[in-house]
């Protein structure tokens, strides 16, 4: 394995004296390096847009989204996946994050897991992957065997495949139908890809999941109308969203929220259309979940 050609493994010329910097110097240089990350992501927007479009189309056909990765890359996939459940009110199976080595690898490194190119296919088989699904392989280096094996298995079934790497001309790009490459350059701490590379990956994953959820009607204007009120904060937010979407007062929001069985989206449609719950729910069904399509012009 030759790591010398990977920019994520190169030494950063700006931080050769990192161990002798003052805290102010360290914080300043790290902040400056981090500012380059969104610009790198911006250079890949066209490919990211293609990926969002693909995920959205598969969601509309009942497909699922799987993130696969090892180490930090895998953890970021799991993080994005689990947040989709309360944010967009989806079932946990719709977006899943798989990490090399299984759940225990979220907190402890599992030796050899990322180098096993058969492990991801086994993980995906357990989830009954089909051609209707999408697999996003995440690897900062762009050469992780676990990810490559998973992408190849997905492709063999006819599933959509997307890769996300932080090096140009990466190996995993050759194994995906849509290849996202966000080269962030050398880290301030050589080879520590949890830094700029991890930040870039998180930014892209945010775009993939959020963009696709917008595309299937999980958002009204810029409000998360399918949020699940699973705690006190989200309960308060749910009522606030109803007020913001309909310009109603808090008392009305609270009343209709309960009538709608604490379904934010349904409550909004009931208020905007002045329909009772059953009819409002039917309007939402006909509109494929898009609130904007239920409102008379």
Curated annotation (Swiss-Prot):
CDD domains: SIS_Etherase. The keyword Transcription regulation does not apply. It is an enzyme of class 4 (lyase). One of its GO terms (molecular function) is carbon-oxygen lyase activity. Keywords: Carbohydrate metabolism, Lyase. Homodimer. It catalyses: N-acetyl-D-muramate 6-phosphate + H2O = N-acetyl-D-glucosamine 6-phosphate + (R)-lactate. Pathway: Amino-sugar metabolism; N-acetylmuramate degradation. This is N-acetylmuramic acid 6-phosphate etherase. A lyase-type mechanism (elimination/hydration) is suggested for the cleavage of the lactyl ether bond of MurNAc 6-phosphate, with the formation of an alpha,beta-unsaturated aldehyde intermediate with (E)-stereochemistry, followed by the syn addition of water to give product. Belongs to the GCKR-like family. MurNAc-6-P etherase subfamily. Pfam families: GKRP_SIS_N (PF22645). Residues 55-218 form the SIS domain. Its EC number is 4.2.1.126. HAMAP family: MurQ (MF_00068). The active site is at 83 (proton donor), 114. Specifically catalyzes the cleavage of the D-lactyl ether substituent of MurNAc 6-phosphate, producing GlcNAc 6-phosphate and D-lactate. One of its GO terms (biological process) is amino sugar catabolic process. It comes from the Bacteria.
